[in-house]
Amino acid sequence: MKKLSKRMKALSTKIEDRTYAPLEALGIVKENANAKFDETIEAHIRLGIDPKYTDQQLRTTVALPNGTGQSIKIAVITSGENVAKAKSAGADLFGEEDLVESINKGNMDFDLLIATPDMMPKVAKLGRVLGPRGLMPNPKAGTVTGDIASAIKEFKAGKLEFRADKAGIVHVRFGKASFTENALFENLKTLQESIDKNKPSGAKGKYWRSFYLTSTMGPSVQVDINALQDYQPES
C-alpha cells in the first residue's frame, strides 16, 4: 500500500469522515490546494451503472459556465476547404490523410480530436491508437461534426467531454484552485445537472453512489449530492 506523505497526512486530519455541503467542500479543497502551482480541482463520481451494457453507458459533453482554466490542444481531421477553416478557427493541428497517417504512427500531441463526417471511415482505422486514450471522435461528444469552427470555439472556451469508466466512475477536471468558490460551484452545479440529464436508460437502483472533490495534490472531500441537487439560486 502506498504511504501518504507527511503533507497529505496533515491535510487529511483536517477533514472529517462525513459528507460536506458543496460550498463547504469547495472551501476545504481550495484551502488545501497550497502547492507551488495552480492546482486543478477535480470531481470523482461513482455512479450506479455498469458500462459493459450499452444502455448503462454515460458519455456526453458539458459547457462549464466559467471554463476549466486549462488550455487544450485540438486536432482536426477534415478535407478540402474545411482544412483552412480549422486553421482559422484556432485548431492546433489540422489535416487530411496526412494527419491520419501521422496519428497512426503514434504522433498524439493533442488533447482532443475533431473530425468531419466524411473523414470518419479513415479515422475509424485509428481505433487501435485512439480508443485506449479516449480520443476517438464521437457524434454524442460533439467531436464528429460538420461545423468545425463552432466545435473548436466551444471546446476552447471550456466545453468538455466526460464519460463513465469501466467501473462506472466519472472523473472531471472542472476548474483551478485560483477560481473563486462561487465560480467552482457554478461549474460543479452545471456538471451535476448534465450527469442527471444524461442518466442512462438502463441505470438501476441508486444512481449517485459517491461524490468526492479533490485538488491535484490535496486529499479528497466527500460531497452531499442531495444538497447540490436541491440547490436553488436566490431569486
From Swiss-Prot:
Part of the 50S ribosomal subunit. GO terms for biological process: regulation of translation; translation. Binds directly to 23S rRNA. The L1 stalk is quite mobile in the ribosome, and is involved in E site tRNA release. This is Large ribosomal subunit protein uL1. Keywords: Repressor, Ribonucleoprotein, Ribosomal protein, RNA-binding, rRNA-binding, Translation regulation, tRNA-binding. GO terms for cellular component: large ribosomal subunit. It comes from Prochlorococcus marinus subsp. pastoris (strain CCMP1986 / NIES-2087 / MED4). Belongs to the universal ribosomal protein uL1 family. One of its GO terms (molecular function) is structural constituent of ribosome. Gene3D superfamilies: 3.30.190.20, 3.40.50.790.
